[in-house]
């Protein structure tokens, strides 16, 4: 859930029927080629939420690089919310009337309307399932215990002021810490923070263990890559070192599986959002066990279940691996996490 804050400063009296509005196009529901989209409006606790989604959701259906999801529900929440079409938008602009009955095949929008001079809108995305993790379908961390996107929006609305205060307090702390380094470092750190946090998804496996999984954009779309985690860790070493453990946990888990029959750390866990086994450095052989298993340059696609294969499968080309880099990354991350105060249990479990 995200906030869009606004305040109106009129150059005179506002008309009695003034409003502030925000809208989203149906393109948020699919990747590339236009698809059938449906939607509606939810009456909630003191506000409304309009939503739309692909008519046929294909959850976690694409592991290609640099793509938008072909699944999930997109929301706008405001005092009043609408699902409208092109024709409905034109009618609203020309005559001030809202058509809440879009026709089939019309291009859809969701619209939020407030009638206060100062306020905020909420936009939200419910991916329904966030990560496939070696046989487990995992939801976003907030949804543990049966919570829904409605709970997330209700919470974000009820705790709006408190959340913004926490953000302001953290921002002040970050600014103070960055001032020790030098002028301009705070601006750089703000950009790095947004990139690092935005690149990761937080989920929890069936054992109750945290997983903080990155997506490696413009580099095969790999998930949980050790050499992406490594440059991401400074922020979390400072403010939440347990998230560094959560970055490493997947590498440890996959390294113990029979298909990974090496004594060094793997590079990745698959391609986002599928943790189904490392995809980097696979062996291309012209035999019946390998030929046709891997395709390059094809999109959309989903991963094969490499993690279930026995050691004899010989899936990987050892000449394409990075043992020094990945082991170095993991050793430094684990030592740094412990030094920063993370739970030592993960290290004890994996370095007996």
Positions of the model-derived regions?
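Mature, folded catalytic cores of secreted/periplasmic enzymes
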Residues: 6, 49, 330-332
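Short, well-ordered beta-strand segments enriched in hydrophobic/aromatic residues
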Residues: 2-10
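Aromatic-rich carbohydrate-recognition surfaces in CAZymes
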Residues: 10, 115-119, 138-163, 221-352
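Acidic/polar, glycine-enriched structural segments that form the non-catalytic walls/loops
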Residues: 9-224, 241-245, 252-258
């Amino acid at each position: 859930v995200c906030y869009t804050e606004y305040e109106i400063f009129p150059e005179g009296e506002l008309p009695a029927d003034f409003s502030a509005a925000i809208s989203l196009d149906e393109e948020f529901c699919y990747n590339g080629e236009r698809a059938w989209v449906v939607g509606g409006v939810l009456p909630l606790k003191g506000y409304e939420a309009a939503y739309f989604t692909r008519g046929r959701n294909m959850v976690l259906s694409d592991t290609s690089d640099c793509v938008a999801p072909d699944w999930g529900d997109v929301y706008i929440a405001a005092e009043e919310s609408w699902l409208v079409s092109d024709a409905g938008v034109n009618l609203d602009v020309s005559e001030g009337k809202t058509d809440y009955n879009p026709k089939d095949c019309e291009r859809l929008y969701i619209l939020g309307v407030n009638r206060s001079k100062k306020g905020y809108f909420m936009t939200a995305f419910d991916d329904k399932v966030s990560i496939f993790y070696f046989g487990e379908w995992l939801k976003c961390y907030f949804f543990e215990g049966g919570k829904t996107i409605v709970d997330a929006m209700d919470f974000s609305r009820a705790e709006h002021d408190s959340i913004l205060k926490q953000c302001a307090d953290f921002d002040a702390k970050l600014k103070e810490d960055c001032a020790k380094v030098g002028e301009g470092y705070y601006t750089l750190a703000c950009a790095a923070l947004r990139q690092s946090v935005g690149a990761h998804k937080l989920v929890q496996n069936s054992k109750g263990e945290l997983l903080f999984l990155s997506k490696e954009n413009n580099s095969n779309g790999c998930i949980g890559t050790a050499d992406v985690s490594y440059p991401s860790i400074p922020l979390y070493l400072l403010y939440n070192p347990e998230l560094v453990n959560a970055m490493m946990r997947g590498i440890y888990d996959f390294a113990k599986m029979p298909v990974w029959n090496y004594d060094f750390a793997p590079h990745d866990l698959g391609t986002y959002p599928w943790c189904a086994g490392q995809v980097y450095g696979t062996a291309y052989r012209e035999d019946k066990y390998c030929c046709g298993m891997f395709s390059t340059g094809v999109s959309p696609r989903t991963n094969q279940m490499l993690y279930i294969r026995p050691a004899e499968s010989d899936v990987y080309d050892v000449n394409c691996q990075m043992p020094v880099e990945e082991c170095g990354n993991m050793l430094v991350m684990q030592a740094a996490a412990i030094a920063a105060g993370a739970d030592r249990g993960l290290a004890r479990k994996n370095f007996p």
